[in-house]
Swiss-Prot record:
Principal EC category: transferase
Limits of the DPCK domain: 4-200
EC number of the protein: 2.7.1.24
Any Gene Ontology CC annotation: cytoplasm
Keywords, ordered alphabetically: ATP-binding, Coenzyme A biosynthesis, Cytoplasm, Kinase, Nucleotide-binding, Transferase
Pathway(s) served: Cofactor biosynthesis; coenzyme A biosynthesis; CoA from (R)-pantothenate: step 5/5
Protein name (record): Dephospho-CoA kinase
Job description of the protein: Catalyzes the phosphorylation of the 3'-hydroxyl group of dephosphocoenzyme A to form coenzyme A.
PROSITE patterns: DPCK
Matching Pfam families: CoaE
Organism: Lactobacillus acidophilus (strain ATCC 700396 / NCK56 / N2 / NCFM)
Subcellular location: Cytoplasm
Superkingdom classification of source: Bacteria
Family: Belongs to the CoaE family.
Amino acid sequence: MTYVLALTGGIATGKSTADQFFKNKNIPVVDCDQIAHDLMKPKNASWQAIKDNFGTEYLNSDQTINRKKLGQLVFSDPTALNKLNQLTHPLIFDKTIQKIKMYQDKDIVILDAPVYFESNLDKKKIANGVLVITLPEATQINRLKQRNNLTDEEAKMRIKSQMPLNKKAQMADFVIANTGTIEELENKLEQLLIKIKEEG
């Protein structure tokens, strides 16, 4: 049976580095953010839902979603964020299940789901185990500012839009603190894989 490991954490905590580590091990990664991104392309399901519910002012001239403008709205207005999530999360969930089923012949599949708990995927029993990657908030803010070219305030608002990392850690099966080098993170991930294979 395939072991589905949900990978979550906060923004800029090191999930992409973990993804790359697993891909290098030939372990398939189902990326919920990529699925969400694809569904937002013109004429796709999320695109239609956003256009119908938020209006054409959130579209660019080429009909793509103005992600920056939509982001500014939802990361500053919890009601708008909740509305967006209610529209898109069921669509993302259906596509995610389809993707996971494609890898039924694999021992392990990684489900990269940044908002795993926020979107109630834990209630749907979609994964066999949940890994949370944590990071001190000051480091998280600095990484996010550099990566996304955000102000201090914008970075803090994005972090606050997600469930606190310490709460996610309490709900997880495995917790890795990403406080060192990439090599140290990879060593911790390697140990986790060994543990899962031994228990599986």
